């Protein structure tokens, strides 16, 4: 941003290090500052920027336990990052004229409950708000941001934004148990990671570049009406209250489909158009029915563990799942802990089912055997096969006969000779 004006020398330098009122007074008449302001271990309750309108740099305020209030009545612009960290007594900040800031990075502000900002702030790319006492988050006009991370704000019950694109990550977690999240215009996002949320409203979301992670949430309904692609994994873990899921247009997952211990989800029939799962399929819980009618390809394994007595592993393992899994095995464990496994073939022609009962016995094998072909008996069988193989050349298997003679005594040999002589002489 080009500002054509003369800026006094004392208002221009790389860093302005401020620890007390005297340091702050040195820049009190600056309307524009070029450089980074760093306030640490400030020894007064109130920090005031009376005349500052534009800061071409970062504003960092940290580790100042005495500070309870920060005022900037006419500040319009912070071109870089507005960072506040470890201000344990801060209760209020007031920037009523602020219209532009690039990054908000607020952490460990445990009693901050009042923020007075202009409702038309633009230019924000990254927002991190963690460990505050804020009750709401809204009011930013950016159509596109890179990252939004709102976590560990124990009183925060409303998160709203009209942002349309988040190129990086949206992470929400460990805020109030009844927090309601609404992004009514969001269409595309990189990574979506939502935890501990009561309501989630994303009616326009169509495309997720990375993964969709929904863990430990309190919502009952979850609808992604327009979502058609997830580039990574779809993970739903221990969302104990959800009983109504809708993914009517989801066509492809670049990663796996993982659903674990979502107690009220008994029938997995809400992916009517899903064709491709680029990773593994893993379903664990009180599952009574699995219906993935349009599924054509699973590039990983398929693992199902059901605690419902209604679910029939044998029946499910013989369905079309045999033809679509390419990544290794199909494994299904029922409520009796009986496991059925199958090795699948890459050409989609199915595989052999193997049933493993609840209790299994271990067969002891002879570890001394080193022969890998022919019969699979003990050492005697292996030795015989080796002798037979080594004597297979030449006439009549002579070596076998010689080896056999080694086991006869002299008297047995004489008796055999007499018998042979008599057989030739007597006919004469």
Where are these regions (language model features)?
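Intrinsically disordered, low-complexity polar segments enriched in Ser/Thr/Pro and acidic
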Residues: 1-5, 256, 365
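Cleavable C-terminal sorting propeptides in eukaryotic secreted/cell-surface proteins
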Residues: 397-428
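N-terminal signal peptide
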Residues: 1-13, 421-428
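C-terminal low-complexity, Ser/Thr- and acidic/Pro-rich disordered "stalk" regions positioned immediately N-terminal
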Residues: 328-400
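Concave beta-strand-loop units of leucine-rich repeat
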Residues: 10-26, 33-48, 56-112, 116-135, ...
């Amino acid at each position: 941003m080009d500002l054509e004006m003369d800026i006094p020398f004392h208002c221009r330098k790389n860093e302005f290090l401020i620890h007390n009122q005297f340091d702050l007074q040195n820049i009190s008449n600056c309307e524009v500052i070029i450089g980074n302001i760093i306030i640490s271990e400030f020894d007064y309750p109130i920090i005031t920027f009376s005349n500052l309108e534009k800061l071409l740099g970062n504003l960092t305020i940290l580790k100042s336990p005495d500070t309870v209030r920060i005022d900037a009545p006419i500040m319009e612009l912070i071109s870089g990052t507005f960072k506040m960290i470890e201000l344990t007594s801060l209760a209020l900040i007031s920037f009523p004229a602020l219209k532009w800031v690039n990054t908000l990075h607020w952490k460990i502000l445990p009693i901050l409950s009042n923020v007075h900002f202009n409702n038309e702030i633009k230019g924000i790319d990254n927002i991190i708000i963690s460990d505050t006492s804020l009750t709401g988050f809204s009011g930013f006009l950016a159509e596109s941001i890179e990252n939004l991370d709102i976590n560990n704000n124990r009183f925060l019950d409303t998160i709203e934004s009209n942002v349309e694109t988040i190129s990086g990550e949206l992470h929400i977690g460990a805020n109030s148990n009844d927090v309601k999240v609404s992004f009514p215009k969001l269409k595309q996002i990189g990574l979506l990671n939502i935890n501990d949320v009561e309501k989630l409203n994303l009616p326009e979301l169509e495309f997720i570049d990375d993964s969709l992670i929904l863990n430990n949430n309190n919502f009952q309904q979850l609808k992604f009406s327009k979502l058609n692609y997830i580039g990574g994994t779809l993970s739903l873990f221990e969302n104990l209250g959800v009983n109504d899921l809708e993914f009517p247009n989801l066509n492809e997952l670049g990663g796996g489909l993982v659903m674990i211990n979502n107690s009220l989800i008994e029938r997995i029939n809400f992916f009517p158009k899903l064709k491709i799962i680029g990773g593994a399929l893993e379903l664990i819980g009180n599952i009574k029915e699995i219906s993935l009618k349009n599924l054509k390809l699973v590039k990983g394994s398929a693992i199902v563990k059901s605690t419902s007595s209604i679910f029939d592993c044998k029946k499910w393992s013989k369905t079309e799942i045999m033809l679509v899994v390419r990544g290794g095995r199909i494994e299904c464990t029922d409520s009796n802990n009986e496991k059925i496994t199958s090795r699948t073939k890459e050409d989609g022609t199915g595989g052999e089912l193997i049933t493993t009962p609840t209790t299994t016995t271990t067969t002891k094998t002879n570890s001394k055997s080193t022969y890998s072909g022919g019969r699979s008996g003990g050492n005697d069988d292996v030795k015989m096969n080796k002798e037979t193989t080594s004597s297979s050349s030449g006439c009549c298997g002579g070596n076998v006969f010689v080896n056999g003679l080694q086991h006869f005594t002299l008297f047995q040999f004489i008796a055999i000779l007499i018998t042979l002589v008599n057989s030739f002489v007597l006919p004469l």
